[in-house]
Amino acid sequence: MNNKIEPLILIGFMGTGKTTLGQFLASNNQLSYIDLDEHIAIQENKSIPEIFEAIGEQGFRKLENEYLQECVQRYDIISTGGGIIEGDESFRILKEQPKVIWLDCDIEILYKRIKNDSNRPNANNKSLFELKSLYSSRVSRYNEIAFIKVNSSQSLSDLQNDIMEAIVCE
C-alpha cells in the first residue's frame, strides 16, 4: 500500500458485515485487504475464542492493538472485530485515521446472525438483552471515531456507493 493513502477501516458491532463488505470492496477496486481478527488468529496460530481463553480479553486487546498498528501501514482496507473500540490504544489509533466507516444494523437482525456463533466469544449463547446491552455500551465509541455511519442491511453495491460518495465528497 502507498503510505500516502489512508486505509479504509470498517468498524461496527459483530455481525454487521465488515468482513463481507471489506472483501467486496477490495475485490471490486483491486485494493489490498485484511480481516484483523483472521490475521490475529493466523499469526497466533489460535482461534479468537482460544486466544480469549488463554490470555483473556485484555490480553487479546493488547494483541489486537499490535496487529492494528502493523495493518494500518500495509493495507488499503481493514475490517476489524466488533470490540476493537474497547482497547484504549486501538481506539486512539482509529481516532487518528480519517476513513473509519461504521457499519450499523438493527440489533435484532444482528442477534439472529450471531447468537449461536461459537467464534464470537462475546456473543455466543448471549440473550438479546445481553447483546443489546453490549451494543449500547459501544455505540458512543463507534460514533466518536467514525467518518461516516452506513446501514449495513442494504446491498453490498449500495454500501460501496454510499462509502465512495462520502469519500469523494470529503
Swiss-Prot record:
<feature type="binding site">
    <location>
        <position position="37"/>
    </location>
    <ligand>
        <name>substrate</name>
    </ligand>
</feature>
<comment type="pathway">
    <text>Metabolic intermediate biosynthesis; chorismate biosynthesis; chorismate from D-erythrose 4-phosphate and phosphoenolpyruvate: step 5/7.</text>
</comment>
<dbReference type="GO" id="GO:0000287">
    <property type="term" value="F:magnesium ion binding"/>
</dbReference>
<feature type="binding site">
    <location>
        <position position="120"/>
    </location>
    <ligand>
        <name>ATP</name>
    </ligand>
</feature>
<dbReference type="GO" id="GO:0005524">
    <property type="term" value="F:ATP binding"/>
</dbReference>
<dbReference type="Pfam" id="PF01202">
    <property type="entry name" value="SKI"/>
</dbReference>
<keyword id="KW-0479">Metal-binding</keyword>
<comment type="similarity">
    <text>Belongs to the shikimate kinase family.</text>
</comment>
<dbReference type="GO" id="GO:0004765">
    <property type="term" value="F:shikimate kinase activity"/>
</dbReference>
<feature type="binding site">
    <location>
        <position position="154"/>
    </location>
    <ligand>
        <name>ATP</name>
    </ligand>
</feature>
<dbReference type="GO" id="GO:0005829">
    <property type="term" value="C:cytosol"/>
</dbReference>
<dbReference type="InterPro" id="IPR000623">
    <property type="entry name" value="Shikimate_kinase/TSH1"/>
</dbReference>
<keyword id="KW-0057">Aromatic amino acid biosynthesis</keyword>
<dbReference type="InterPro" id="IPR023000">
    <property type="entry name" value="Shikimate_kinase_CS"/>
</dbReference>
<comment type="function">
    <text>Catalyzes the specific phosphorylation of the 3-hydroxyl group of shikimic acid using ATP as a cosubstrate.</text>
</comment>
<feature type="binding site">
    <location>
        <position position="138"/>
    </location>
    <ligand>
        <name>substrate</name>
    </ligand>
</feature>
<dbReference type="InterPro" id="IPR027417">
    <property type="entry name" value="P-loop_NTPase"/>
</dbReference>
<dbReference type="InterPro" id="IPR031322">
    <property type="entry name" value="Shikimate/glucono_kinase"/>
</dbReference>
<keyword id="KW-0808">Transferase</keyword>
<protein>
    <recommendedName>
        <fullName>Shikimate kinase</fullName>
        <ecNumber>2.7.1.71</ecNumber>
    </recommendedName>
</protein>
<feature type="binding site">
    <location>
        <position position="61"/>
    </location>
    <ligand>
        <name>substrate</name>
    </ligand>
</feature>
<dbReference type="GO" id="GO:0008652">
    <property type="term" value="P:amino acid biosynthetic process"/>
</dbReference>
<comment type="subunit">
    <text>Monomer.</text>
</comment>
<dbReference type="GO" id="GO:0009073">
    <property type="term" value="P:aromatic amino acid family biosynthetic process"/>
</dbReference>
<feature type="binding site">
    <location>
        <position position="19"/>
    </location>
    <ligand>
        <name>Mg(2+)</name>
    </ligand>
</feature>
<dbReference type="GO" id="GO:0009423">
    <property type="term" value="P:chorismate biosynthetic process"/>
</dbReference>
<feature type="binding site">
    <location>
        <begin position="15"/>
        <end position="20"/>
    </location>
    <ligand>
        <name>ATP</name>
    </ligand>
</feature>
<keyword id="KW-0067">ATP-binding</keyword>
<keyword id="KW-0028">Amino-acid biosynthesis</keyword>
<feature type="binding site">
    <location>
        <position position="82"/>
    </location>
    <ligand>
        <name>substrate</name>
    </ligand>
</feature>
<keyword id="KW-0418">Kinase</keyword>
<keyword id="KW-0547">Nucleotide-binding</keyword>
<keyword id="KW-0963">Cytoplasm</keyword>
<keyword id="KW-0460">Magnesium</keyword>
